[in-house]
């Protein structure tokens, strides 16, 4: 599975971008908000969600981990697939969605073309508990880790990434806490690299 791509923007379409990684062009679908921030010829890192189906393999790219999380979160709603999830994220930021769901504001979703009253209601109802869980977990992480440069949701993703790389959850949380305490402005990439380096040096 592809987790991220770092490369140069070769070209763009209405709903996708071609990222050139060492001469190989990857077609990556993205939201309008993400596409609007990409410039041809410039280098970017995109967080990738890979969808493997019998008839195709599609890559979906995001400039932030938050957008990737909400892309998957939206698809947990009955009636929302990848295209609709991207369409919603083209109109609303993850923060917009979080606030709307917490406030039970269906109108913000109904204002999006293709989202009717019933779907707007399902989004609010089905995401209410999930968004609240993200909010609460993020607040706890932010408070305990004193995060400045790294957002709460992103820090949680770093912990998950470290667990996938062989850390126990306890080890991952302690590693992230220790590193950010020493360097609150550290980037996500450097945080993961430092955690891995520190772990390897202990063996």
Swiss-Prot record:
Residues 143-149 are annotated as: Flexible linker. Residues 64-142 are annotated as: Domain II. Keywords: Cytoplasm, DNA damage, DNA recombination, DNA repair, DNA-binding. The keyword Zinc does not apply. It is found in: Cytoplasm. InterPro entries: DNA_helicase_Holl-junc_RuvA_I, NA-bd_OB-fold, RuvA, RuvA_2-like, RuvA_C, RuvA_C_sf. GO terms for biological process: DNA recombination; DNA repair. One of its GO terms (cellular component) is cytoplasm. Pfam families: HHH_5, RuvA_C, RuvA_N. Residues 150-203 are annotated as: Domain III. Its main location: cytoplasm. Belongs to the RuvA family. Has three domains with a flexible linker between the domains II and III and assumes an 'L' shape. Domain III is highly mobile and contacts RuvB. The RuvA-RuvB-RuvC complex processes Holliday junction (HJ) DNA during genetic recombination and DNA repair, while the RuvA-RuvB complex plays an important role in the rescue of blocked DNA replication forks via replication fork reversal (RFR). RuvA specifically binds to HJ cruciform DNA, conferring on it an open structure. The RuvB hexamer acts as an ATP-dependent pump, pulling dsDNA into and through the RuvAB complex. HJ branch migration allows RuvC to scan DNA until it finds its consensus sequence, where it cleaves and resolves the cruciform DNA. Homotetramer. Forms an RuvA(8)-RuvB(12)-Holliday junction (HJ) complex. HJ DNA is sandwiched between 2 RuvA tetramers; dsDNA enters through RuvA and exits via RuvB. An RuvB hexamer assembles on each DNA strand where it exits the tetramer. Each RuvB hexamer is contacted by two RuvA subunits (via domain III) on 2 adjacent RuvB subunits; this complex drives branch migration. In the full resolvosome a probable DNA-RuvA(4)-RuvB(12)-RuvC(2) complex forms which resolves the HJ. This is Holliday junction branch migration complex subunit RuvA. It comes from Rickettsia conorii (strain ATCC VR-613 / Malish 7).
């Amino acid at each position: 599975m592809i987790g991220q791509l770092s490369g140069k923007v070769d070209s763009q379409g209405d709903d996708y971008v071609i990222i050139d990684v060492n001469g190989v062009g990857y077609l990556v679908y993205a939201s309008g908000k993400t596409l609007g921030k990409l410039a041809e010829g410039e280098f970017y890192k995109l967080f990738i969600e890979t969808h493997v189906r019998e008839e195709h393999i599609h890559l979906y790219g995001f400039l932030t981990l938050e957008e990737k999380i909400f892309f998957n979160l939206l698809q947990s709603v009955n009636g929302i697939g990848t295209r609709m999830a991207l369409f919603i994220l083209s109109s609303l930021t993850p923060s917009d969605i979080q606030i709307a769901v917490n406030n039970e504001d269906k109108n913000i979703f109904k204002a999006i073309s293709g989202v009717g009253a019933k779907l707007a209601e399902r989004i609010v109802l089905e995401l209410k508990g999930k968004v609240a869980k993200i909010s609460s977990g993020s607040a706890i992480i932010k408070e305990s880790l004193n995060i400045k440069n790294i957002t709460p949701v992103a820090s949680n993703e770093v912990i998950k990434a470290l667990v996938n790389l062989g850390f126990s959850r306890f080890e991952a949380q302690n590693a992230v806490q220790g590193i950010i305490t020493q360097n609150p402005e550290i980037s996500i990439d450097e945080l993961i690299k430092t955690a891995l380096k520190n772990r390897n040096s202990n063996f």
